[in-house]
Amino acid sequence: MKSFDEMTPKEIVRELDKYIVGQTEAKKAVAIAVRNRIRRQKLPEEWRKEVLPKNILMIGPTGVGKTEIARRLAQLSGSPFLKVEATRFTEVGYVGKNVDSMIRDLVEISVNMVKQEKMKEVEERAKELVEERILDALVPESRAVPAITNPFINLITGGQQQQYTPEDRRRFRAKREEMRERLRRGELEDEEIEVEIEETASPFMGIFGPGMEDLGIEISNMFSGMLPKRKKKRKMKVSEARKVLLPMEAEKLIDMDKVIQEALDRAQNRGIIFIDEIDKIAGKESASGPDVSRQGVQRDLLPIVEGTTIMTKYGPVRTDYILFIAAGAFHVSRPSDLIPELQGRFPIRVELSPLTEEDFVRILKEPENAIIKQYQALLSTEGVELVFTEDGIREMARIAYQLNQRLENIGARRLYTVAEKVLEEISFEAPDIPEKKVVIDAEYVRKRLERIVQDEDLSAYIL
């Protein structure tokens, strides 16, 4: 498979088609946006500064694929991705999260992403170091060879001094190599050992109340560099010790300064922020009430989307080249209800179409992570073969579509609810089913859902 930087917009759309049904216009828009980023990197320096990303506004009801398109795109491109709800934020001066916290969160995600990549690169070396630490615990030097006590040295030092002969050293090395072989063969996985680990608990996190978590994290990070890291000894099995020690040893092998430098660059030039429910902060100008705060959030959001510098604990971050994708249903408000300056910062507008019954059929069958494929994989672990007939799939799609028309339209999410109810009995009885092949046809689907679908009140609560 090609690297992402070599993929054309058509190929990006084809990759997205593997997971998301329909919505071609939205896929095209995001594919062009990320391809333009790659093109920008190839420009001369003076032009690179001038070319800014074209932010996208997705308009469509819930459950049609807005978030999934952005998330899959970020995974495909290896970009730091953050999803936020516009309603989480409050105007500066009010209790709650300020909008610039989204940039700090994006940088944190970017740092963790780069750190994991670098740790993966040094994993083999880290495994060797973990093996040595486990052997140190399994074969401590003092236990492996008997000590020779020198009374004259004891008199001078005031304590016992251990001395080892060459023969003792040879025996110790032989014992250690023997244990190494057994360890590699997996014979010692259940042995209990005592290892020294660093404590990760933060003493400041419990002090601050709801809405103040960010402050607790910042203060904790500030003091973590000043206070020495506390270590404690823990008893655990060799298998558990390997999992605990591997990230600790890998972290020692990477250069955090380089990690932070690369992470900041990636966040600034490849970061994607998905702002959901932006329609909830849109509204006509009002002198009082909640609209004051909504207008304030929009005005606070404006400089970040336009391009500004936000201070983070890793250093300053420019937001000029971060791609912002905003989304909303816009049932009550319209995109034109956003303040004009913010509207201008989302020049690409894409309308996502509501899902049809045929779309539901395709969603159940086609994506690589399709719902029925997930259930088949889950129940195969119990030895149950789940077979969905064509009419069974169509019946599930028909019922989900009808429920969306009658009740609240929640898009493709309705399929999860319907599928869960259809397969509830099988999931419960799976370990005890004598017949390991189960066929889900239209009759079975109707039998499981008929009473609930017909009863309006039950449908509202259960489906």
From Swiss-Prot:
Q: Which SMART domains match?
A: AAA, ClpB_D2-small
Q: Which organism does this sequence originate in?
A: Thermotoga neapolitana (strain ATCC 49049 / DSM 4359 / NBRC 107923 / NS-E)
Compartment(s) where it occurs, according to its Swiss-Prot or TrEMBL record: Cytoplasm
The entry's ATP-binding residues are: 21, 63-68, 276, 341, 413
Could you tell me the keywords of this UniProt record?
ATP-binding, Chaperone, Cytoplasm, Nucleotide-binding
> Which function does this protein serve?
ATPase subunit of a proteasome-like degradation complex; this subunit has chaperone activity. The binding of ATP and its subsequent hydrolysis by HslU are essential for unfolding of protein substrates subsequently hydrolyzed by HslV. HslU recognizes the N-terminal part of its protein substrates and unfolds these before they are guided to HslV for hydrolysis.
The record's similarity note reads:
Belongs to the ClpX chaperone family. HslU subfamily.
Q: Which gene encodes it?
A: hslU
The record's listing under InterPro entries reads: AAA+_ATPase (IPR003593), ATP-dep_Clp_protease_ClpX (IPR050052), ATPase_AAA_core (IPR003959), Clp_ATPase_C (IPR019489), HslU (IPR004491), P-loop_NTPase (IPR027417)
Q: Which GO terms describe its cellular component?
A: HslUV protease complex
A GO molecular function annotation here is: ATP hydrolysis activity
Identify this protein by name.
ATP-dependent protease ATPase subunit HslU
Whether Transferase counts among this entry's keywords is: no
Q: Which PANTHER family match?
A: ATP-DEPENDENT CLP PROTEASE ATP-BINDING SUBUNIT CLPX-LIKE, MITOCHONDRIAL-RELATED, ATP-DEPENDENT PROTEASE ATPASE SUBUNIT HSLU
